[in-house]
Amino acid sequence: MTPPIADRLYQQLEQILASRIDPQRIITQEAKRLAYGTDASFYRLIPKIVLRLKSLDEVIFAIQSCGQLGIHFTFRAAGTSLSGQAVSDSVLITLTDDWRGHEVQNQGLKIRLQPGVIGADANKYLAPFQRKIGPDPASINTCKIGGIAANNASGMCCGTAQNSYRTVDGMQIVFADGYVLDTRDPESVARFKQERADLVEGIHALCQETLANSELTERIRHKYRLKNTTGYALNALVDFSDPIEVLTHLMIGSEGTLGFIADITYHTVIEHAHKASALLVFADIEQASQAVTTLSKTPVAAVEMMDGRALRSVADKKGMPEFIAKLDLEAAALLVESHASDAQTLHTQCEQVMSALQRYQIIESVPFTSESKTVATLWGIRKGMFPAVGAVREVGTTVIIEDVAFPVENLAAGVRDLQALFDKYHYSEAIIFGHALEGNLHFVFTQGFDKQSEIERYGAFMDDVAELVAVKYQGSLKAEHGTGRNMAPYVELEWGKEGYALMQKIKALFDPKRLLNPGVIINEDKHSHISNLKPMPAADNLVDRCIECGFCEPVCPSRTLTLSPRQRIVLYRELQRRRTTGENVASSELEQVFEYQGLDTCAATGLCAERCPVGINTGDLVKKLRTAKYQKFTPIARWTAEHFSATTTLARTGLKANQLATKVLGEKSVGTMMNGLRRISKGKTPLWMPEMPQANTHSLELAVENLPRSDKKVVYLPSCASRNMGQQASATDQRPLTEVTLSLLNKAGFEVILPTELSSHCCGMPYDSKGMTEIAQSKAQQLENALWQASQGGHYPILMDTSPCAKRSIEQFTKPMEILEPTGLVSRYLLDHLTLAPKQETIMLHVTCSSRRLGLENDMLKLAKACASEVIVPEHIQCCGWAGDKGFTTPELNAAAVHSLKEQVPAHCSRGFSNSRTCEIGLSHHSGIPYQSILYLVDEVARPRLATQESTEQPSEYA
């Protein structure tokens, strides 16, 4: 047990840290400590201080400051680890977005990465070289390099040959006393050997001690035939003799208990361009396991095993093969994938695989295919299993995913014994799947911790699992998820007294004060795995399925400003728990924090739902909670909805007044006056910015009347924003979007139909975002009826010129109508009738969150590339955070969401494009260049395709 630390020491530490670190990044507020302290594991420790550090100097300073006061600390990257290795009741050190540096080296053969780089981003940087990093954890779209290396994470294809231990080239390390070593720098190494001879000699002594014990040496070599992340990487002591190499490899998988990895260089691996997958079903686990042994000798990259219960858990999911629902629980499936550099080689490999399996009876199958939709469905089966259990669990329980490895020759027996333990301890919902080539199995089950009897059941179950895996089959209790707190009590059981003693010596050598992440890997408390368990109280059925995995966080626009979706749910659960126990939270710090950080700064655009493994849209909860907050404004809102034409006329008048004032007084004077008023009103008036749109004075109805008639027709619904907002004064093309849209439709030869009473229509989003569901639904219904009539019962396509309106209408409408935003309409209907002459120009492209949710990201990029020679989609900006009117009312959300935009705009780039008029205001403001609808770009490069061309030319891919 770690001894308690006096509060005065934390107060002293806070004062010391504040002398060199921005106090806003030193978090001591209770609610934020709770939110920031949560990770994906089922353990709950609340840190006393959370640090968000932006530089190596700050990390060194924090480590040394903690060391001076004897205060322990823990490092956290993305917080997706599952074994409790990234929670702390002391000081939690996290990193800002400043730690995303990367350098591709040797034409992609190596890559240098800072710990804040997301794994998938590293692969994106390597993609042009047909390379990738070796580790491929399931959380790769969220987890960061720091965690990947510190946990020695692997994955489906990685195995033991391509994990961090095998592919690390070198790293920069900060030790427990703040000393820095760069193992890639000869001068740094020479200095280290001289100044830290104690560490060098200590490592050498450990190697000698290990090699002198032939039995232990053989045990180490034997155990690392399998995936193994239980304890420290003892194989480093037998694989290497150079102390620097030993040290480097000991850091891999050390879970922040030996030092901080400040950056790392990996040897990369080939990313094959050609892949094929097959689903093969066998009558039972024995036959499937025998097939795995056969497959290990064939050219396969991945073999995923799924037991009968696992298959049953996803049988009713959309797109699943029909035969899955008919399989009995004895069945077992293998999802097999093969990779090759060319199509012919891949075809030959697939034939070799199936030929090798001829002696087995395959009762059902989806044959090898490279067709993207089918492949996605097949891997959707495997990836959907963990969330499938999570989605149906009882409220108040958590989902636990354990991670073991059996010798492959004992795979079937191990599965049978695990299934017997499920029955013994009444885990009827438990499923098994995993990376069969490595004997690495995951089993998933639900567990409540609200009763002592449930905690004891879990404890007894884990005792039996440990005995089964580590003793009976001599396997690994943690194959790839890391030891953490979860398996720390069993490390000695798996490794024996000598192996465990060696690990204790490693810890003492690197961290003599035991300040680095105490309780992780080395823990004398035999009950640590059933202590400090995270409560999962019922909060709201919209979010009760949340497993707090954190997959949502990278796409959230408020994650660096206030809270992420995971953190919002954590705080709301705590609020509800306190309410349930009768505590008055009405004026508590937690309630006040949640009001602004949880509700006001949530964009509620739902990108989190796209990343959530169980499909939770935290924005839906936020909008529901906003209902009470905005209830007093409901009468005003209802009046505006019923008099929408008058409301928009007032808005347009306001834009005209701003336009006139700016012309007469100048931008600087108007800005000073309006933003001064905002300060006086404490943010109750909207932010003014130079990019404010002018009023749209285009007479749309009259213009439509003057267009020629055609047998090609489209219904056009300009959004409220498009109808009323013109362009900013600095935009090159000053035409309103409505005029540009008509120009493009006319070039393509389409007749335009407007719905009746156009100025009174709205999709309802402004009301929905405030939680005024009834009013929002009423407006949506009114619009649906008008569009149904205008499209002659859905006969003609309908264009909504901003993507948020299109997305909401698609979701809300019940009548069969084809609703399209600009990219969809141009791609599907207009391009066949246009010829594009692309500009030799670099442009910026922002893909809105609604476009992403509609699955249009690739289509939008493809269209932009057909219109301009270079298209830049800025990194790390998923949602701009404008969120309807929040860019005016909560501008800090927009600023945080696009804070990295301006630095990504090249000097020779003068404009950007998107497909949401309001989003374009904030993008223009923060980028320094005007953003307009992508329809402006298409109209600029498009010309009508002649009738003779249409009849003789095949429609090209955006030619």
Name what the model sees in each region:
Residues 511, 619-959:
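Iron-sulfur cluster-binding electron-transfer modules in prokaryotic oxidoreductases
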Residues 528-548, 582-604:
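Ferredoxin-like iron-sulfur electron-transfer modules
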Residues 388, 489-538:
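Activity-critical C-terminal alpha-helical subdomain
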Residues 42, 82, 87, 126-170, ...:
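A gly/ser-rich beta-alpha-beta helix-loop segment of oxidoreductase catalytic cores
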Residues 1-64, 78-109, 257-275, 310-329, ...:
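N-terminal flexible segment immediately upstream of the FAD-binding catalytic core
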Residues 17, 41-73, 91, 95-137, ...:
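N-terminal glycine-rich flavin-associated loop
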Residues 522, 559-594, 615-640, 932-939:
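Non-heme iron-sulfur electron-transfer modules
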Residues 518-520, 551-575, 601-628, 808, ...:
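Iron-sulfur cluster-binding cysteine motifs and their immediate structural context
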